Amino acid sequence: MISSKATSAARACARTSRVMQQQQRRLLATVVSSSSLFPGEPSSPHVVTSQIPGPKSKELSDRIGTFQENRTHGFVVDYAKSQGNWIADADGNVLLDMFAQIASIAIGYNNPDLLALAKTDEFITATMNRAALGSFPPTNWQELVETSFGTVKPDGLNNIFTAMCGSCANENAFKASFMAYRARERGEKAEFTPEEMSSCMKNQSPGSPDLSILSFTSAFHGRLFGSLSATRSKAIHKLDIPSFNWPVVEWPDVKYPFAQNSRENAEAEKVALAAVEEAIVSSKKTGSSYGPVAALIVEPIQSEGGDNHASPAFFQGLRDVTKKHGVFMIVDEVQTGVGATGAFWAHSKWNLTSPPDFVTFSKKMQAAGFYHNIETRPSLPYRNYNTWMGDPARTLQARQIIRTIQDHNLIQKTDKVGNYIYEKLFDLIENGAGRGKIEKLRGENAGTFLAFDGRTAKVRDQLIMEMRKLGVHMGGCGDKALRLRPMLVFEQKHADIFLDKLETALGQL
C-alpha cells in the first residue's frame, strides 16, 4: 500500500516535471509562428463566388431550414477544410476569419495540438463515457481541473464551478450570489424555516425572496431567464419573454478615442457610479420597484451591445461601491476572457484592490463556468447542481488550449498585433479611406479586441458584405459597430491582409 507521503511526493514530482516542460516549451515559443502551427495555412483569401453565401451554401441552409431556424445563417462552413485563421465554406470560398465563431475559437481551426488530443485514450474515454460530474466524477477529475482551469485562476479566487455555456455560467453565478446573500442575512449556521421551505414551492417569499441583479444598458449576459433579465443589448432578444423586474443603470456615455477624451469620460463614469450606488441604496427602501440588489454583473468590455469601454478607475469604483453595500460583483468574461485583450483575463488590467466575487467564462475556453471562493459555495449540496456540471472532454480541450497559449506566448503576441492594428486603423480613419465612413475607434491597449463604428448602420452592414466578397469574414455588434474578433494565432501578416482589404472595401462604399 502506498503511503500518503509517497503519494504527495509523486504529485509534487509530477508538478515539477510539468513546470520544467512548460518552461522548455516557452523557450522555443519565441520562434514559433502561426505558419509553423499551421504549415498548410493559406497565404491569401480565395473567393470563387460573386456573393457569400454562394449557391451551395444557400442550398444547404435551405435544407436545414426545413426542420430548424436558418434565417440566422451567415454561410455554411466546411470545417474539415478550415485551417488556422482561415474558414472555408461549402462553395469553396476561403476567408480570413476575423469573427472566429463569435469570438469562440482561440488557437485556430484544426489546431494540431487539439487534433492530437482528440486521438488520445483519455479524450476518447471522456467523450464516450460522459460523466454526471456532480455525482459521479471520474478518477482524474481533480487533476484535470487543477491542470486546466486551476492554472489560470484569477487572483483571489480559489473555487471553480464548471458549467455548460456562458449563459448558464452567469445564471449559476446569479444563483450562488442569491444563496450567499440570504445566508449572510440569516447568519452562518441558521437553518431554513418551515415557512421558507413551504413558500418557495409556491414561488413566494420568504422562501423565494424578492432579490435582484443590477446590470447596465447595452449589456449582454445570455438568454436564459435570469441572464436574459440582465441582458439589455437588443429588444429582439427579449420580446415576449417574461423577465424579472431588475434594475438597470446607464453605461457611461464615453467618447472615442478613449484616451483623447479622458476628462469627459471620467465625468461620465462618475455619473454612472453615482447611479449605481443610488440603485443599490434605493433597492433596500420600502416601496422600491425592485428587490434589494444582491449582485452587480458587468462585462470588462460590453461586446454584443456595441464594444463599449470604460476605464480601470470605473471598475475600481464599482468594486468600492459593491463592497460598501454588501453587493456581490460578478465579472462576465465570457467574451473577453482567454487572451484576446492582451491579458488572459481582461479584468486583471484593472488592478482592483480586492478581487471580484465571481468571474464567469466560456467561449474561447471551449468550456464554461465561474471562479469564486468557498464563502459563496451553497450551504447544502444539490442547491447549485445539474446532471452534467460541465464536460470532461471540453475540460481536456480547455487544458490543451491553455497550454498552447502559454507554450507559444500567444497573449503577448496578440497584444503586439493588436497595437499594430490599432495604429493602422487610427491612421486609416483620420487620414485615409475610412475618413467620413468609419469612426469611434476603440480598443487601444486591449489586444485585438478592437472595434469601430460605421458612420451609419447601413454603412457598417455594407462594409461587412464588401469585406466578405474580398475574402475577410467579420461581424457587427450594437447599433452600428464592427468588431474585430480574430484568434490568438492571428499575426501581423494576417493583419496586413485585413487592413489591405478594409482599405479596398472602404474605397468601394
UniProtKB/Swiss-Prot annotation:
This is 4-aminobutyrate aminotransferase. Pyridoxal 5'-phosphate binds at G166, S167, T387. Its EC number is 2.6.1.19. One of its GO terms (cellular component) is mitochondrion. Keywords: Aminotransferase, Cytoplasm, Pyridoxal phosphate, Transferase. It is an enzyme of class 2 (transferase). It catalyses: 4-aminobutanoate + 2-oxoglutarate = succinate semialdehyde + L-glutamate. CDD domains: OAT_like (cd00610). Substrate binds at R223.
